[in-house]
Amino acid sequence: MGSALIQGAINAKILQPSTVFGYDKIIAASESFAAATGASICSSLEELSQSCDTFLLATKPYDVAAVLKNLAASRGDRPALVISIAAGITLASLESYLPKSIRVIRTMPNTPALVGKGASAFAVGERATADDANAAEKLLSSVGLALQVPEKLLDAVTGLSGSGPAYGFLIIEALADAGVRHGLPRQDAIRLAAQTMLGAATMVLETSLHPAQLKDMVTSPGGTTIEGLAALEKNGVRHALIEAVSAATHRSIELSKI
């Protein structure tokens, strides 16, 4: 995900490869990052901390403390900005490892950022400035939609857009299975289902109409669509999706307390 965000920023001309430096304790991961972005690779966290003033923290949650403590020791009192995509790590936790000279922003991107169609949200820490928020928005906007929200809403963001791609994949798979059931070749069914969901989403974003209005526009009295919708309602699909988002949101809250 970190590579996707950096590559998006480079493609959008927000960053130049010559200004990007990276480090990963796994050498192969560092090499892959360099190949994807054209960035320079540092041999240690200490070297990285001396090379940049803005840091994208794209590590596993269990590595966050060690990485930030190292950064704090290496930077001293020199100002810096940390933008974290580490799942479940709160702003308070991030800030607790850092001196007051280092500002923090917490983000929740999703996997469609890998193809430039992400939906991300971010929250700013107590020491972050308006310029910091603008920098985070530019970075996240380079790979899709970016919204600033209060941190208390990031768990809901996780349940909705963070986990949402998996719900979408399941829906596409189910639609394709239904097409296969009625005679469509598998690959054709998948492409039709995926393009249909893409088209529906694009209509919502580009028309600014409520999804219910768009649904009504394609639902003729006594037609095929209303029969399909009635079957969805009868089988609780709407409720199942609401419960899926709620379950993922509650799990995100639990993980942030571990």
Regions found by a protein language model. Name each.
Residues M1-Q50, K117-G118, V180-H182:
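NAD(P)+-binding Rossmann beta1-loop-alpha1 motif at the extreme N-terminus of oxidoreductases
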Residues L5, A9, S30-A34, V67-L71, ...:
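Hydrophobic packing residues within well-ordered alpha-helices of enzyme cores
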Residues V20, S30, L48, V64, ...:
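Small-residue helix-packing motif on alpha-helices
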Residues F21, T37, L45-F122:
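Rossmann-like NAD(P)(H) cofactor-binding subdomain of soluble oxidoreductases
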Residues S93-R103, A119-V157, F169-E206, R251:
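Internal alpha-helical scaffold of NAD(P)-dependent oxidoreductase catalytic cores
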Residues I105, L154-G159, P211-D216:
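Short pre-catalytic strand/loop immediately N-terminal to key active-site residues, enriched for Gly-Thr
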Residues A194-I258:
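NAD(P)-dependent Rossmann-like dehydrogenase/reductase catalytic/cofactor-binding core
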